[in-house]
Amino acid sequence: MQPPGIRLCRLEEIPDGDSRGFDPLNTGQNTMLVVRQGGALYAWRDACPHINGVPMAWRKDAYLNAGRDRIVCSAHGAQFDIATGLCTLGPCLGQSLEPVNILVAGDGTIYWQPRPR
C-alpha cells in the first residue's frame, strides 16, 4: 500500500504543548514545523513571513515562547498564533505563516502531504 505522504514521525514523538522541526526533503535544514496543542496538530513552513526564508527556531525544535502558547521567530521576536499562523506581535503584524498539509494515519504516524504543483 502506498503511504499517504512523506513520513515525519509518530504522534507520541511530539508531546502536547511542544513543537518539532522537520526536513522532509533532506535539504540540510528544517523546512517545516509541527506544534501539538490541546490534542490538535498545526503545521507551518519554517520561514518567517517578515524575512522570507529565515528559520524560526532559536535552537533545535525550539519554536514556542516560554508560555508555550505562541510560535516565536528567533530572528526578531515576532509572535504567531499557533492555530492560525497569524502574526500577533512584531514587524510582520497581520501576516501569516504558510500552512503545510499533514495527515495522522490510523497507526499514529504523521505524514506530510505536499501540495501538487
Identify what each model region corresponds to:
Residues C92-L93:
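Short Gly/Pro-enriched turn/cap motifs at secondary-structure boundaries
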Residues G77, C87-T88:
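A conserved acidic, glycine/proline-rich C-terminal tail/linker
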Residues M1-G67, D81-I82, S96-R117:
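N-terminal pre-ligand scaffold of iron-sulfur
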